[in-house]
Amino acid sequence: MQKEIYYTFDINNIKDKEFTKVFVDCPWEAIRNPTPIDESEHLQWLKDSNLFDCDQDAENFFKDKTYIMSSYINPLNPKDNIIWVIRMHDFIYIVDDFYFEKGLLGEEWVINMFDRDAPQDKIGKTFWNIIEGMEKTGNKKAVEQLLHDTKIWALSVFTYNKCNINSESSFEYYCKYRCLDVGMDFGLSTAKVFAEPLPKEVLESSTYKRIIFGYNQTHSLINDMVSFERERKESNRMANYVMVHAYKTNSVQESMYHCKQMVEGVFNEINVLCEQLKREFPDVSNLDFHLNLIKLVISGDNYVSNDTTYPRYNLNH
């Protein structure tokens, strides 16, 4: 008998519905950026940002304390730069949550926003104000890469919405879309926006590309494990690998453990690949710095994602 293929998720189709949260063991220590966050100043920026319809919406968003995640995945950014990075991250959260997910902004708007010479609406003006702050406090080439990665993420939202992920999709097919949608190329770009970029030959090497692919895989799976409960309650869309694999095993719990094992396996692979890359490019002076930063971004994301007190991922806050 041919196996039924599901394009939406309904936990009633899964035999094992009960599950406990599973935590990923990360081999690298998470470090929070030491720069203290002036909460009242940041809240006022949110209110003045032209990104919300009213101050109450800004206050409600502020309660998510997204700046905590930003501080952990941007641990080394200097004091004058981190404020712009946090604003950039919040800009992305807000545009995604309040505009993209509600279908209020589309691909044409994204293309226009990234054209610096084009007339901008109030949202675009806020974006370019942040970029100017980045340019004043960061590395020019790194800011250009950040712009590229941010645009790729923004456009990927619409590509991801069109993909047909289902209960029989392979992990490779899922990653093709999800690794862009989760936006961690953007996250890594902000973490190193103040630093001299790696040479082109390193960035284009197969080993470095495998490291970045693994980096994106870990973030996708960690995000899926953390957001599974919220996503299944908010939408029946098959947008999470925990959902996909649960249909393969008929168990949410087994799917959670499977994702945990996959992430921890990728951690080991990244360690091996980093050592291999250092052997391939022994004379690149900033290679160690960049490889360490990749690990710090992963560990920071994992740490905050598994912090049950982090408001954005806490369903009860």
From Swiss-Prot:
One MF annotation (Gene Ontology) recorded for this entry: lyase activity
This protein's record includes keyword Metal-binding: yes
Any Pfam family the entry gives: Terpene_syn_C_2
Keywords: Lyase, Metal-binding
Motif (NDxxSxxxD/E motif): 223-231
Enzyme Commission no: 4.2.3.-
Class of this enzyme: lyase
Motif DDxx(x)D/E motif per record, residues: 96-101
Listed InterPro entries: Isoprenoid_synthase_dom_sf
Keyword Protein transport belongs to the record: no
Function recorded in the entry: Terpene synthase that converts its substrate farnesyl diphosphate (FPP) into the sesquiterpene CAS 137235-51-9 as a major product. Is also able to convert FPP into 9-epi-(E)-caryophyllene, alpha-neoclovene, beta-neoclovene, and 3 yet unidentified sesquiterpenes.
Family: Belongs to the terpene synthase family.
Entry's free-text remark on domains: Contains several highly conserved motifs that are important for catalytic activity including the aspartate-rich 'DDxx(x)D/E' motif and the 'NDxxSxxxD/E' motif, both of which are involved in complexing metal ions to coordinate the binding of the isoprenyl diphosphate substrate in the active site.
Name assigned to this protein: Terpene synthase 3
Record gene name: TPS3
